[in-house]
């Protein structure tokens, strides 16, 4: 199941308590204090990871507590640090304070991480309190508690382009035709129940991310239908592709449908209504005479706006206009990326090649399984291991002849 909003409480690990101990050793009178410090509690880190597409792992667990630090011990032995708790979230996750509602952090880049709660500091042992005036201190410190945070995590998909429109307008079909995404497609409204993302490869060097959200209906901004729950997924999109069906199955007017969606965007977020928009009439094979297209174009000519520069017609069934549409989208996306770079903003690119390379740890065999010369070079083996024991033909161990290093 798809989860894009969860409420979680995090608690970092408590620091370990300091130890009160005195050195007790034979022939060492008045050994003095030797209590070690407690270890620092574990912190909780959130990391944006490629391949994580939902907040489902947080849906059934509402409280995360990190490991405590170890207690200090005698002989000046410090407690061990708590093991860091690292949790992976999708790129585009916003961390919001549940009490005040302000955004604490936006994780938008692959590999970006944020320490949501820091572990408590370990307490000092009594050895720390030794002074010339107090040679045998009998005091220590308790470990400090770890930070606690109650947050809401919201997933806002990292998409360059957002597909919007009425239910059954052909959004999922278009996504499946121009990308490798395979959303559920059927001939009834509200087939799409959660957002789908697809990467559209224009050529070897150019690509963009397309987000398909459930269809919007009148009253969506007030909680009617499904689309209002997922409008946040197009908030980051710099371009909206508004799909219009020429002959809606419910017999509604395409122009009125377009106006209704625009009003819902305005009610949800005024910045979305002012976003760059490309209007596309889908299923053009159902309008062979071009009558609906002429009506739509006439409406846009009478109501000029920045968001409706022109009208395009496509057919996902016959591939009419798809190549031209993808080219136009790529041009607008590239222009926006250039504007972001000029403004000092790094565009978010989610590709497999962008993922941070994690060095592989060398696998070491336990001593009882490792060969006698497995960790040595051939040169060392030849010079220093000539005296190694060998097996005779009878299966008995025959000691080798040890070489004199001085010779």
Swiss-Prot record:
It is found in: Cytoplasm. The keyword Metal-binding applies. Mg(2+) binds at residues 172, 192. GO terms for cellular component: cytoplasm. Residues 353-407 are annotated as: Disordered. It holds the Pfam family GTP1_OBG. Its cofactor is Mg(2+). PROSITE patterns: G_OBG, GTP1_OBG, OBG. CDD domains: Obg. Belongs to the TRAFAC class OBG-HflX-like GTPase superfamily. OBG GTPase family. This is GTPase Obg. It comes from Rhodopirellula baltica (strain DSM 10527 / NCIMB 13988 / SH1). The lineage of its organism: Bacteria, Pseudomonadati, Planctomycetota, Planctomycetia, Pirellulales.
